[in-house]
Amino acid sequence: MDALELKNIISDGLLSFPVTDFDQNGDFNKSSYAKRLEWLAPYGASALFAAGGTGEFFSLTGNEYSEVIKTAVDTCRGSVPIIAGAGGPTRQAIEQAKEAERLGAHGILLMPHYLTEASQEGLIEHVKQVCNSVDFGVIFYNRSVSRLNLDSIQKLTEMCPNLIGFKDSSGQIDMMTAVTQTMGDRLSYLGGLPTAEVFAAPYKALGCPVYSSAVFNFIPKTAMEFYNALRSDDFETTNRLIKDFFLPLIKIRDRKSGYAVSMIKAGAKIVGHDAGPVRPPLSDLTQADYEDLAALIATLGPQ
């Protein structure tokens, strides 16, 4: 799949990041992960991100990264495209991007570099080197210490033909308005804020109708119902789900740092698709929080 094909795929539909399965010792559970992908693939996501943030990308060793990407590509071949997470320091990101391309992934989401702040000149060089190391499509993840301004985005799109996507987790509406209005269809735009459904309508109004859904991991039917309602401007349905489900979900998520990932794994366990524990420094939900989440999920009915 070339970069333009990937751009077209991520320009429409719902995207998601499957959690990564670990056994009770915290080791990668390949068979359980494959079964998870087999369960999720038919629900209709346009693409799945393997080893993304929700997939605990930051906790995977080099060998595990390769295993996760290979398992995802092999399991979903012919059914749904796989986009691999890649990131950290420039040379590590290049190594991961090349490995993902070798294993048959259809592109990468370029995750933030680690820890250090960087100038716009440094970020441009970082993104350029990663893009130049591969032929397939690259989606830039605008978040944390890795944020590009409009001028930098314009320069990179001129230098890197395979930079085809911009995923925003900054929540800066003025910035996103400037980017979408200036860059037009040169890029595909993805909403990337936590619990993205709550922000989906305003992002759609900016020309960013696509987002990645974490809750697709445990309520895929409801996740698709929300997306389809958003797409058709069925505000009665989207507002009902935001009020009755997503806002209460955010209250649980915000009880502890790191719950944005831990809560998704807990949700998968509640619906019968246990992905095992999260790895430190994340912590699993407390029993009380787990029970609150289970009660909330139960209000949605079968998935």
UniProtKB/Swiss-Prot annotation:
Assigned keywords, A-Z: Lyase
The organism's taxonomic lineage, starting at the top: Bacteria, Pseudomonadati, Pseudomonadota, Gammaproteobacteria, Moraxellales
Any GO BP annotation: D-glucarate catabolic process
Enzyme class (EC, first level): lyase
Name recorded for this polypeptide: Probable 5-dehydro-4-deoxyglucarate dehydratase
Organism: Acinetobacter baumannii (strain AB307-0294)
SUPFAM superfamilies on file: Aldolase
InterPro entries in UniProt: Aldolase_TIM, DapA-like, Dehydro-deoxyglucarate_dehyd
NCBIfam families: KdgD, PRK03620.1
